[in-house]
């Protein structure tokens, strides 16, 4: 039986055992099954690390977005590259992702806000950064009171749902009865003219809180506290900017309402955001996408519990069915002239200084009542302390009854007016308490106190839609510390300023009305938090970086593609976005199309590079002097660096330009193996993320060892190594080492012999004969006849021994003294 058949038979038996365990009384977990399967695979044979290039894996990233636009105005083209006619979008099925992170860490929101600030600085570019109005002025305060006036309205507006004969709605107060009292200062000051010793007196108007006066001697407020810059031109703010990712990156977009209680599944991969609204406003977001349903997006740095609900901030996406809009206008009742000064500045002032020339009017149209009621219902889902009557839609009547039945109108008004709004009656910075917006390049600051007061009164059955506005020239900088001085309103008696803004978002925070926190109200956010206008768009996006290199254990046999793999080429033709289309598929099915997939990935990155380079070359003359031009070039370099880094890493592992690369590194973690039939690459990467560092180091070491072995093998097989035997220099070198070895042995022998001799001499006197021989001599005594002859011989022998002994002693003494010395 072959290895493959044995493997299949063991798998079959394993599945039978697991099935019986599940059917029995014992409960077996899924992890136990995976562990048993892993042990089975380990018993069958070793597994080795295999490198895959082109897997659908990503991680959150931070990089510069590319500013793209299809607008042809100069101020946009100097900062952005032209956008493409269309951008691809690919759905990613069977993938869940978390989109409820911190808003301040969302790269789309953060970069869109800074990009828009750069754009607005370009639109409203100051001439020079000096304090043009920091001079002594003589001013007189006047009050221009617009008494109670009636403003005819030709088209009635409702605040209910879709107008029909069966729905009751709030009637609209057609009379503008708000008293508008604005303090106005008529100021005179001198500037040096263009001629020598000539001065010119300037007379202009300032809003009451823009100047600080003592005895009619005034200076512009905050003159010594911040930088004041004068604007030189006007511009129109329109929807024209896209935020696009550089090559190698993708934006994930969630296509449903955000939910903190579960992961998001309806996800698609895109290259660019939707059009960003290039406007600056407070309280409301204008001219954005028409939302199908309401959605609350928290913008707090951290989640707060119910006990701190009054401190939370939100962005509410207003459903488009309510048709909320704000119409603003200013009559063409003034002219503007400019006066040059010796410093090169142009001071703009009006020809009619005695009148309040900067007033405008805005009208709130649409079904505001039901819109605020729907907001209350969304807040009630988060906190039960927000009381909402869910039966307000049950109030119905005919059209004639709706006009006559005032009691039913009052009941309907009380029903929907459960959410209170801060009416800004407390003292404070009036600029922060007024609704700010741009209207044809002018800065409108509108007082909405009367509107909020009418809404907070449950007995008021009518909707009051009017807000008086002031066109301000001195405005706080919303991006940094400082104040900007804008041009006076557009000149010309017949030049009316008109604009209509669709309300698509509301920006507010929760406040407690009493100390017991039983009642709460909302407070719209001031202009200092203009970054909130991008939360409604950016919260549904996540910037990620493609990680195309994957590592997984496989069998020793090289993975081969089936014969029909060419049919899958069309499924991944979208390049880098097509790579993510298989993110929810199993690892095995992705590996089948991996060759074409990785080729498509490389092709997609290269194609993005070509498109980006072509667009940058078209705008090179305009982009080279701007900061955004540098950022756009930097994004291209970043994407190239990432691609080269991946290829260098594959080269270190010996997997250059290989889609599936088998290695000799053993997979030691037998308890962690992929489920090729049901597990995705994203899930596998999450499980083995902590092993990546060790595996990559082992791959590098294994490839280095393989390279050394290959080099040594090549050396053995090289014929030139055998020819070195006939080289004379080679023989001389080894002969020299042989001579040194022989001389060393001889010297060692001499030293050992000398040491033995010295050691013997240092042992001292030793008897010539042994004790046994002396005993035998005494034991065998000779006869008397022989005694004399033996004694003579013995005497001679003793004398010789004494001489020898004395000689030895003298020699030992000499050697001892020599050794001591």
UniProtKB/Swiss-Prot annotation:
Positions of region (V3): 328-361
UniProt entry keywords in alphabetical sequence: Apoptosis, Cleavage on pair of basic residues, Coiled coil, Disulfide bond, Fusion of virus membrane with host membrane, Glycoprotein, Host cell membrane, Host endosome, Host membrane, Host-virus interaction, Membrane, Transmembrane, Transmembrane helix, Viral attachment to host cell, Viral envelope protein, Viral penetration into host cytoplasm, Virion, Virus entry into host cell
Region annotation (V2) ranges: 187-223
Annotated region described as Fusion peptide, given as residue ranges: 570-590
Glycosylation, residue list: 71, 98, 144, 175, 190, 215, 224, 266, 287, 333, 383, 389, 394, 423, 447, 516, 669, 675, 694
Post-translational modification (record): Specific enzymatic cleavages in vivo yield mature proteins. Envelope glycoproteins are synthesized as an inactive precursor that is heavily N-glycosylated and processed likely by host cell furin in the Golgi to yield the mature SU and TM proteins. The cleavage site between SU and TM requires the minimal sequence [KR]-X-[KR]-R.
Site description Cleavage, residues in chain: 569-570
Extracellular side: 1-737
InterPro entries: Gp120_core_sf, GP41-like, HIV1_Gp120
Molecular-function GO term, any one: structural molecule activity
CDD domains in alphabetical order: HIV-1-like_HR1-HR2
Transmembrane parts of this sequence: 738-758
Region of interest (MPER), ranges: 715-736
Region (V5) residue spans: 515-526
Note: This is an African mandrill isolate.
Domain notes: Some of the most genetically diverse regions of the viral genome are present in Env. They are called variable regions 1 through 5 (V1 through V5).
Protein's UniProt name: Envelope glycoprotein gp160
Organism of origin: Simian immunodeficiency virus (isolate GB1) (SIV-mnd)
Taxonomic lineage from the root: Viruses, Riboviria, Pararnavirae, Artverviricota, Revtraviricetes
Gene that this polypeptide is encoded by: env
